[in-house]
């Protein structure tokens, strides 16, 4: 199971007895510098994790990584469908980490939209029109 703390710090068990954890922070630089900062991790994330589960303070840090994380800044949810201002431009983006989990349903939905078939899934709440209208979806538990 995935545990998400109110601050957005998340963690889950990984194969081999490992623990995977992370957190996206507003002050993170945008760009292509994928250098992982061990010191920053130890100063910011580790104390929060150990405060939540004191036994975690005895864990050994093995490695870390950094990378791009696509985020829909309006509400953190997918943007699916035809862009109203450009006919024929279909979007499937802004998943904020949900993409792999939702890919099968999204692929089916977009294929049906593009071929002008009636969608068998009702995913209209993710329509690009909500972006233009500034109508965010609310969901707790996004990381």
Regions from the PLM with identified roles:
Residues 50-143:
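C-terminal catalytic lobe of FAD-dependent flavoproteins
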């Amino acid at each position: 199971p995935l545990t998400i703390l109110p601050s957005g710090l998340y963690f889950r068990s990984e194969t081999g007895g490992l623990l995977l954890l992370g957190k996206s922070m507003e002050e993170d630089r945008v760009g292509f510098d994928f250098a992982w900062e061990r010191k920053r991790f130890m100063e910011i994330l580790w104390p929060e994790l150990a405060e939540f589960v004191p036994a975690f303070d005895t864990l050994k840090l093995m490695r870390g990584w950094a990378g791009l994380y696509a985020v829909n800044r309006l509400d953190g949810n997918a943007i699916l469908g035809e862009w109203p201002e450009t006919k024929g431009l279909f979007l499937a983006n802004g998943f904020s980490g949900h993409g792999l989990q939702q890919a099968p349903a999204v692929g089916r939905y977009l294929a049906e939209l593009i071929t002008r078939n009636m969608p068998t899934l009702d995913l209209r709440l993710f329509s690009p029109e909500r972006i233009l209208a500034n109508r965010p979806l609310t969901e707790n538990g996004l990381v």
